[in-house]
């Protein structure tokens, strides 16, 4: 109240003393008010711009969150579907015995190993030279015998399986004569199962396609760091039994599973598509299940869970995306 009564007569007193000073004083006030008005307009504009930027950032973060939630939702569905496919797998042997889940992979692994041993004890014909292999310590015959052993078990040695193997253009060691020799030598395994049945393609083909697509889906997520991708793939890897992991190893060495890594070695080298090594997909495999020396021949930079980190592996981790 005091300041109201004090300030109210002040302009009039100033006008009575010197009208020119009163005019200057009013002009100063008007200029000040005008300046504050300009500043207010500027601040209002800046506030509006800040609001738009804040809204944009909020929407962008919300979009990222939605995309991440969508990725996780789809990935966990793939995990569930892949596990269900493995658990519900059923294979009926020619003698009528049924094998379920991991038992199917156990039988398949035994047949692959028996087939490989059979192949290495025979001289299979080759009609044309085979190009040199990029893996140190791996002979041409060893790689091709692994490929044949897996494909024979996958397709089987029934009429259709033999036809597929004979028409294969990915391996010139496979010929009609070779198939006849395999058919004669590959008798029964210790479980009494013969290879004249239709093979395992109807049971494991879908499983391995789904497994590959699940890991590839994670690998292609540009919004994730390599560390984040590794943790997601680690969830899937933890679901695999030792038998599944061992069969996966042989699958990755065959023509059928070359996209796991071998297709991206050598001339077409792309470390970010070499999924076996990048995500240590067979790193939990016990040494007695598959010879570790054999694994290291094809995947020298893959780290087993009980091994220390090598210098080369550390370099790769920094390069992975």
Residue ranges and their predicted role:
Residues 49-69:
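Transmembrane signal-anchor/signal-peptide helices with a preference for the extracytoplasmic
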Residues 13-15, 44-55:
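Hydrophobic alpha-helical segments of integral membrane proteins
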Residues 28-49:
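N-terminal membrane insertion elements
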């Amino acid at each position: 109240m005091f300041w109201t009564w004090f300030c109210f007569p002040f302009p009039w007193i100033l006008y009575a003393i010197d009208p020119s000073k009163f005019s200057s004083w009013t002009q100063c006030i008007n200029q000040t008010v005008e300046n504050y008005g300009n500043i207010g307009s500027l601040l209002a504009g800046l506030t509006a711009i800040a609001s738009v930027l804040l809204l944009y950032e909020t929407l962008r973060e919300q979009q990222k969150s939605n995309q991440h939630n969508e990725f996780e939702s789809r990935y966990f569905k793939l995990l569930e579907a892949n596990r269900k496919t493995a658990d519900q797998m059923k294979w009926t042997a020619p003698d009528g015995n049924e094998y379920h889940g991991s038992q199917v992979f156990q039988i398949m692994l035994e047949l692959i190993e028996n087939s490989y041993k059979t192949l290495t004890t025979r001289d299979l014909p080759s009609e044309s030279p085979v190009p040199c292999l990029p893996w140190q310590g791996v002979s041409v015959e060893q790689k091709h015998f692994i490929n044949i052993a897996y494909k024979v078990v996958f397709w089987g040695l029934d009429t259709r399986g033999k036809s597929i193997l004979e028409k294969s253009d990915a391996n010139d060691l496979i010929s009609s004569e070779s198939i006849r020799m395999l058919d004669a030598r590959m008798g029964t395994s210790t479980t009494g199962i013969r290879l004249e049945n239709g093979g395992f393609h109807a049971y494991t083909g879908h499983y391995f396609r789904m497994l590959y697509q699940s890991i590839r889906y994670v690998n292609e997520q540009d919004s994730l760091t390599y560390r984040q991708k590794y943790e997601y793939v680690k969830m899937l890897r933890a679901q695999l039994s030792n038998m599944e992991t061992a069969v996966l190893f042989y699958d990755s060495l065959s023509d059928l599973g070359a996209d796991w890594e071998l297709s991206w070695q050598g001339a077409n080298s792309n470390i970010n598509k070499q999924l076996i090594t990048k995500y240590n997909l067979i790193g939990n495999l016990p040494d007695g299940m598959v010879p570790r020396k054999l694994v290291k021949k094809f995947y020298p930079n893959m780290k087993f869970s009980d091994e220390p980190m090598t210098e080369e592996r550390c370099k790769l981790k920094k390069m992975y995306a």
